[in-house]
Amino acid sequence: MAKLPEARNALAFTTFEEHAPFTTFPGAASFIKGFHERGAKANLPSTSVDLLASIAYASWQVLEAAANGAKSLDDKALAAWLRKNHVDSVMGRLYWEGPTNYVMGKDIYKVKQLQDGKWVVV
């Protein structure tokens, strides 16, 4: 998409990019390094960390933190622990509030724009 003329100044949302401030989150640098190394070894055409990769990785971080915190794999125990605690992830600090269980966090969602063929957080 970045190479198409029609995509100039396109907007998208993101929760993770391979630059600051995203790379300051706990484990982000090692996550990026590992993703690049494994992607290159697998001969992937692109080894850039994208939104979906970071969400998947953070999901496992959340599950690990909840299982360790609740000392259980019971879904009700995990949910109860998550409602009372936050999880520091590669996407930043995550927490859950209210009946919807919507993932919250300070400034998690950002807008990025395609500028000169590169995505830039605006």
Question: Language-model features: where?
Answer:
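Extracellular/periplasmic periplasmic-binding protein-like sensory domains
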Residues: 1-57, 119
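Segments of small-molecule ligand-sensing domains
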Residues: 38-121
